[in-house]
Design a protein with these regions (language model features):
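A short C-terminal boundary segment appended to hydrolase-like catalytic domains
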Residues: 307-361
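Active-site neighborhood of phospho(di)ester-bond hydrolases with catalytic His/Asp-centered motifs
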Residues: 42-44, 76-83, 121-127, 192, ...
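Active-site-proximal beta-strand elements of phosphoester/diester hydrolases
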Residues: 37-50, 185-195, 221, 293-298, ...
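Extended active-site neighborhood of metal-dependent phosphoesterases/phosphodiesterases
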Residues: 90-202, 213, 257, 274-296, ...
Length: 361
């Protein structure tokens, strides 16, 4: 009897301690506008976070937020537009633009993405700063060393195709991932290397046109495709890496001919100034007369310019509505959302920040 009384008292104590914990609320709990939707999270170029040690926790906050909101937002994948690091292979610190070596930046980027390993697939279109010594002029990269396919178990079931990188190595620099959702059918997300070679575009085109994937809705992610504000397509950029294709050629050789590529995501461009100087958007019809949404989102100079905090934590929630053709775009910052003091600034509400993309059959 004494033991039973002791057990009951202990149970009551634990219950009383647990109640306040269960009653607590997240700083800024997220939810979908429709509970039957699913989402993908778009993160712009994170290089500004990793190049200064003081900025680095902001990148981890973003990836941790994605992992934490997996169920609430029914997140299927995290998409990145490239430039995980500021410099691929450099040991000389330029205090005017960074205080981390390339190895330190790669290690931190890997650490932050590790928040998603085993939780969510993440799909990265590598940028110019992942290649060469400092800016993407040469073809070598450390990307496959830090992101081998074995590191994230969530890739196992959705990775369906890959193409060798510029060094002839097997890598997810050029990779395709398949998702199946009741309301949207089958989706194919393809990521391509920095300034993709013709053979990469040929691989992606043949994949899209193949019998297996011809009826999929395709999302294509590449680093350089649109300029900020004007949304003009990039062309003939001043990099020594060859062969190379930029926005105009990618449109002509891949996106326009493929009837099922309906969304293109990119980063890369931008200039200090207003938020509008870090984003752009346009729609054009492809060869089949179907609209193709094209969106540039690059956070690196938000939060204080080139030497600021790396992006203020801004990311985009892409909510795929249950009608099977509407994608709601919302621009959100976990950095502002995590504190009640700044929560009112966590969502941007301008015309370029929240809008609908309609993907008609």
């Amino acid at each position: 009897m004494t033991h039973m009384k002791l057990f009951s008292a202990l149970a009551c104590l634990l219950a009383s301690l647990a109640t306040p914990v269960l009653a607590q609320h997240r700083a800024d709990p997220q939810k979908l506008t429709d509970p039957k939707s699913f989402s993908m999270i778009l993160m712009g170029d994170p290089q500004g976070y990793v190049k200064y040690d003081i900025n680095q926790p902001l990148f981890e906050l973003c990836t941790a937020w994605c992992a934490d909101n997996k169920e609430r937002l029914n997140i299927k994948a995290v998409l990145l537009t490239g430039d995980l690091v500021e410099q691929n292979e450099n040991i000389v610190l330029n205090r005017n633009m960074l205080n981390q070596t390339s190895r330190q930046m790669w290690e931190w980027a890997s650490h932050c993405m590790g928040r998603l390993d085993g939780r969510l697939p993440y799909i990265i279109a590598t940028g110019n700063h992942e290649y060469g010594y400092v800016r993407g002029d040469e073809p070598f990269t450390h990307f496959p060393e830090y992101f081998p396919v074995e590191r994230n178990s969530c890739w196992t079931d959705c990775l369906v195709s890959a193409y060798p990188n510029r060094e002839g190595r097997a890598s997810i620099e050029n990779a395709a991932f398949e998702f199946a959702e009741p309301t949207w059918g089958k989706l194919l997300v393809i990521a391509a290397e920095w300034a993709p070679r013709d053979e990469v575009l040929d691989w992606a085109r043949k994949l899209c046109e193949s019998e297996k994937y011809a009826k999929h809705t395709v999302v294509f992610i590449t680093h350089s495709f649109l300029y900020q504000r004007t949304a003009e397509r990039t062309a003939n950029e001043n990099y020594r890496i060859k062969p190379a294709n930029y926005g105009k050629d990618i449109w002509d050789k891949l996106v326009y001919p493929c009837s099922n590529i309906r969304l293109v995501l990119c980063g890369h461009t931008g200039s200090p100034g207003d938020f509008e100087d870090s984003v752009s958007y346009r729609e054009d019809d492809n060869s089949a007369g179907k609209s193709v949404a094209q969106m540039m989102f690059n956070v690196q100079i938000l939060g204080g310019g080139w030497e600021g905090n790396g992006g203020d934590g801004w990311l985009r929630i892409l909510e795929f509505m249950p009608d099977g053709q509407t994608i709601k775009v919302r621009t959100y910052s976990p950095l502002f959302g995590i504190s009640p003091t700044t929560r009112q600034f966590a969502y941007r509400t301008g015309k370029c920040d929240q809008f609908d993309i309609i993907v008609k059959p």
